[in-house]
Structure formats: structure tokens, C-alpha cells
């Protein structure tokens, strides 16, 4: 029995549905005809943008279905979990798989809005900083490193700076706290045994909880119910996040795909470069945005969560703080 997951959300549970035996047989024929169209479900080697990241197919039960029989056959190379749609030339199968969610009885929760987003295909980010281990690198001060000291012209809104003022959002201001806790630990969250089990809120809270759909407020007994700035902020408050500096404090940013999903960024280094990191759902944590820009500043110019490429996460909800020793999620 095969389950399909539309990998599209960062925080909320992704839509899932089951394939019929006839659909399993067609998928089997497609994969056997062109096995290179599938890729590992989760790997640190692919840097995904926010939004649509393909479809994950997994065998949830061994039965008499076409796929189970083929996989149990001797010398069968078929995996029990894989991703479709993340490679060039695989969109036909991905499009067909998405169409299998349209039967009402499957109750897949795939809306017209999600179908429209998925129709745009997967955006793999060519990341200049994706492989950088900031925890052990010498580029924390980008101003002293030529490779990380150049920015293309930033049009529109400039990057926020600590205490810079002029920030309009429902949440808090980015304060220049004197007791920050910084941890550029994307590699820790990208451990193959944990990468798929932690979402953006786990990374923001610096808590590798292995809770794939950790939700603001659940730990505090008041899980966010509306996917709006106000709704998710209420959940943050229940989990102990504050509007002002905290001892040994984490600094995070909340952004919203209106009424659909939430996403977080975490400040991972101090000034003058102010690097930010984030983790799109169950895919790798990284220090770049959807356009491949590294999330840091040089002499006050560059990219931060407020002005980086965020796809459909258009609502900027502000800055929040918590003591790192108490920032647990559920």
C-alpha cells in the first residue's frame, strides 16, 4: 500500500492520500521505464526552496498490491520511500501523481491554491552558502572575506538591523540584546537520522525534538489554531516566547503564508554580519533564501528575513525571544 505526500508546507502537516492498486501499477510502470526520475526522500544534498518540493511516496503496508509484489521480488531495486518531481524531466509523473489526489473520497486536503503552487514545479536553490558550516568556518565576519563581501544590488526594502527601528509588524522589534545565544548548527539538524523528523519550528527553537509537525503553542497547551500572525503569535506566547530580550536568548522571526502555513528563521551569529538560518519542513536547514542569497549583511547591506525571497510566505510577523534552555517544542 502506497501513500503519497505533497511536500509543500514548512510547519503544518502536508496533505497525504493513498493510491489505488491500479494507480500503484501505473506508478510502477513509470518508475521501471525511467528509474532515474526518483530520488531519495530526504537528503542533505538537495537545497529546496519554501513551497512545493515534489511528492514523497512511501510504502506504509506490505500487501498484495502491485508495488509490494514487485518490491519483494528478488533483485528488485525499488525503494520503500522516495521523492518524485525534484529532478528535471520528472514533472510528467509528478503531475500525474498529484492528479491522483483529486478523487473526493481520498480527502487529500489538496486545495486549488496548492495545485496552482505545485504547477510551478520544484525550485532547487543554487546555494552559495548551503554547504558552509558556519559553526567551524572563518567567514562569520563577512566584511573580512571577499567571497562573502559582495552583494548584488538590493532593491526594495533593506535588511533590518538590531535596534534599527521603523519595523512595522504585529510582533516584536529586533532588539540588540546583550545576552544572545547563537548556534550556527544546520549540520546538526541535517543529520540523516533526524533531517526528516524536524520542521522549521524545531530549528528556530534549537530543539531537535524529532517532532516533524511541531506547532507553536502545543507545548504550552494552547496550539495555534488560525494560520495568521495573531494566531501563531498566541501559540508562541503559550510556549514562552517573549517580545523582548531574554538571558542566553534565541532570536527568531515568524512569517506566514496567509491562512495556509507558517515558517521561522533563527539568528545564528552575531554582528556585524548577522547570519540567519531556517529549515523548510523536513528538508535541509540552510543559511540561504529561495533565490540563493546568503542571509547575512555587509556594512548594513544584504539580506535578512524581512527582505529575502520567501515565496508565498508574504506576511512578516516580527521578532521573538526566549531563553535557549527553555525553548522546547511539541
Outline where the language-model segments fall.
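...with weaker cross-activation on analogous glycine-rich loops/strands in unrelated enzymes
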Residues: 224-283
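Function-determining sites in protein domains
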Residues: 1-157
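Cysteine-nucleophile protease catalytic domains, especially the papain-like/related folds used
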Residues: 150-239
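Active-site or metal-binding loop neighborhoods of secreted/extracellular toxin and effector enzymes
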Residues: 102-147, 271-330
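Residue-level detector of buried hydrophobic side-chain packing
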Residues: 27-28, 204, 265
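Sequence contexts marking disulfide-bonded cysteines in secreted/extracellular proteins
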Residues: 176-178, 199-201, 205, 228-230, ...
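Surface-exposed patches in mature extracellular/periplasmic domains of secreted proteins
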Residues: 38-47, 211-223, 241-247, 253
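Residues that flank catalytic or metal-binding motifs in active/ligand-binding sites
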Residues: 51-53, 200, 249, 261, ...
Amino acid at each position: 500500500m502506497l501513500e503519497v505526500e505533497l511536500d509543500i508546507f514548512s510547519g503544518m502537516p502536508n496533505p497525504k492520500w493513498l493510491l489505488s492498486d491500479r494507480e500503484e501499477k501505473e506508478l510502477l510502470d513509470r518508475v521501471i521505464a525511467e528509474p532515474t526520475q526518483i530520488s531519495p526522500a530526504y537528503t542533505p544534498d538537495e537545497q529546496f526552496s519554501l513551497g512545493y518540493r515534489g511528492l514523497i511516496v512511501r510504502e506504509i503496508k506490505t500487501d498484495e498490491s502491485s508495488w509490494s509484489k514487485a518490491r519483494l521480488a528478488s533483485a528488485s531495486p525499488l525503494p520503500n520511500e522516495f521523492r518524485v518531481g525534484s529532478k528535471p524531466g520528472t514533472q510528467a509523473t509528478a503531475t500525474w501523481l498529484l492528479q491522483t489526489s483529486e478523487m473526493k473520497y481520498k480527502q487529500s486536503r489538496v486545495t486549488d491554491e496548492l495545485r496552482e503552487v505545485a504547477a510551478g514545479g520544484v525550485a532547487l536553490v543554487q546555494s552559495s552558502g548551503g554547504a558552509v558550516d558556519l559553526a567551524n568556518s572563518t567567514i562569520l565576519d563577512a566584511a573580512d572575506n571577499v567571497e562573502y563581501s559582495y552583494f548584488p544590488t538590493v532593491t526594495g526594502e533593506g535588511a533590518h538591523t538590531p535596534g534599527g527601528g521603523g519595523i512595522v509588524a504585529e510582533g516584536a522589534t529586533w532588539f540588540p540584546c546583550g545576552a544572545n545565544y547563537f548556534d550556527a548548527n544546520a549540520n546538526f539538524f541535517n543529520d540523516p537520522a533526524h533531517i526528516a523528523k524536524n520542521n522549521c519550528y524545531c530549528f528556530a527553537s534549537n530543539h531537535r525534538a524529532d517532532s516533524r509537525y511541531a506547532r507553536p503553542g502545543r507545548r504550552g497547551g494552547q496550539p495555534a489554531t488560525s494560520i495568521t500572525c495573531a494566531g501563531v503569535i498566541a501559540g508562541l506566547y503559550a510556549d514562552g516566547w517573549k517580545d523582548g530580550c531574554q538571558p542566553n536568548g534565541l532570536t527568531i522571526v515568524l512569517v506566514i503564508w496567509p491562512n495556509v502555513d507558517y515558517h521561522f528563521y533563527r539568528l545564528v551569529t552575531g554582528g556585524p554580519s548577522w547570519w540567519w538560518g531556517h529549515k523548510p519542513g523536513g528538508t535541509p536547514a540552510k543559511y540561504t533564501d529561495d533565490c540563493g542569497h546568503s542571509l547575512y549583511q555587509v556594512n548594513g547591506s544584504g539580506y535578512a528575513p524581512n527582505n529575502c525571497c520567501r515565496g508565498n510566505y508574504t506576511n512578516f510577523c516580527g521578532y521573538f525571544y526566549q531563553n535557549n534552555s527553555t525553548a522546547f517544542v511539541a
